[in-house]
């Protein structure tokens, strides 16, 4: 097994050679490891392009097809020829930019089941934020050209979520992204900003002072190495990383063509929770947010809604539940436990409620019928939530 120094240098090299979600690179690194894969790629780059496949394991070529590798090596060749390993090694040793790899304790556990996740992340700031309790990390995104209403909602919601101990993730752009980060900075809570280029080229430049503040109290992060230019396709790839890093994505003010919807779609594809703040039905800049809710996203109107969306069932004690005195009155202990574990807004199935309450699924199904007749729960497509709360 290669030593850690070689491994880190190879991971950094591959971040320079490839763009996000390079399927061939991910396959090669998964099969051979970053160090061996880099050696093969460098040898192949110096040979005739038609002979590149001869450097790969025969079984790998047979399973994946030779044409795939011809195209991949063609993509990598220019960057392989320009790769300066001594200069890269020197940059890593200076320590201005941290490199987080899959071997590091700070590598995000949230990436465990994410297909084609990066092999390395570049960071400035507190990298321990990457591997904290996953349910505390929430992406909050929205329009760049934010309205007065969106401005007020983003500021208030981000402030309150930060106060509840959540770490908010966003993209550092104008509008909602910037408001979310600024609310966290004012609340003196850490925030993570995912950039679409190298950390030495933060974009937009007008937010440079904010990025400096984030690097001191939170984390600046990118899957692209220093020197990388922010480009349109990298912004789209960055959105996937924002969703992957977070337990949930909350969209605040998005039109039908907003990049925030791209982040939300990535979240859905990754099996993450997605919520949206509703807006006026006659304003097109809110049409995307409203459509998300229509398509099944959780309606978000408060920090409590966000907390309930991301927390395991039965772990959130809602203020609305506490003030509704006597909602468990007249129930036997098992029924009370099952009702207490039933969520307020997002319906849950019998299996989830059974896990949260410690009851058997059969007990949940039996008792839910009685609770529904009493008007204490509502059934929606085979799932339940509390009624009248």
Stretch-by-stretch model annotation:
Residues 1-105, 374-383, 387-389:
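Short, small/acidic-rich helices and loops at N termini and domain boundaries
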Residues 1-8, 16-19, 93-95, 99-389:
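Glycine-biased, small-residue-rich flexible motifs in mid-sequence functional cores and linkers
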């Amino acid at each position: 097994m290669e030593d850690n120094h070689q491994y880190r240098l190879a991971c950094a090299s591959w971040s320079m050679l490839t763009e996000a979600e390079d399927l061939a690179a991910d396959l090669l690194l998964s099969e051979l490891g970053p160090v061996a894969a880099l050696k093969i790629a460098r040898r192949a780059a110096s040979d005739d392009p038609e002979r590149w496949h001869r450097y790969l394991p025969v079984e790998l070529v047979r399973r994946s097809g030779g044409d795939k590798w011809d195209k991949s090596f063609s993509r990598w060749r220019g960057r392989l020829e320009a790769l300066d390993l001594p200069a890269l090694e020197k940059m890593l040793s200076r320590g201005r930019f941290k490199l987080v790899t899959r071997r590091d304790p700070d590598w995000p556990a949230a990436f465990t089941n994410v297909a084609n996740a990066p092999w390395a992340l570049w960071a400035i700031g507190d990298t321990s934020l990457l591997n904290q309790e996953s349910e505390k990390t929430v992406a909050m995104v929205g329009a760049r050209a934010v309205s007065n209403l969106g401005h007020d909602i983003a500021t208030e919601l981000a402030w309150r979520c930060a106060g509840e101990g959540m770490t908010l993730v966003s993209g550092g752009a104008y509008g909602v992204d910037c408001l979310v980060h600024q609310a966290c900075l004012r609340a003196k809570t850490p925030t993570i900003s995912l950039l679409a280029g190298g950390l030495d080229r933060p974009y937009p430049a007008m937010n440079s002072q904010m990025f400096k503040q984030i690097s001191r109290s939170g984390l600046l992060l990118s899957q692209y190495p220093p020197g990388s230019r922010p480009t349109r396709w990298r912004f789209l790839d960055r959105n996937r990383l924002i969703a992957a890093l977070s337990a949930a994505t909350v969209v605040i003010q998005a039109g039908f063509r907003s990049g925030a919807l791209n982040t939300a779609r990535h979240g859905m594809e990754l099996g993450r929770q997605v919520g949206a703040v509703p807006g006026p039905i006659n304003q097109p800049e809110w049409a995307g947010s409203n459509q998300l809710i229509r398509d099944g996203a959780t309606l978000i109107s408060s920090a409590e809604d966000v907390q309930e969306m991301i927390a395991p069932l039965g772990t959130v004690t809602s203020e609305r539940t506490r003030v509704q005195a006597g909602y468990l009155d007249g129930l036997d202990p098992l029924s009370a436990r099952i009702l207490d574990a039933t969520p307020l807004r997002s319906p849950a199935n019998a299996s989830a409620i059974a896990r949260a309450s410690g009851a058997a699924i059969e007990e949940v199904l039996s008792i839910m019928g009685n609770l529904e007749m009493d008007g204490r729960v509502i059934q929606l497509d085979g799932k339940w939530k509390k009624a009248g709360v």
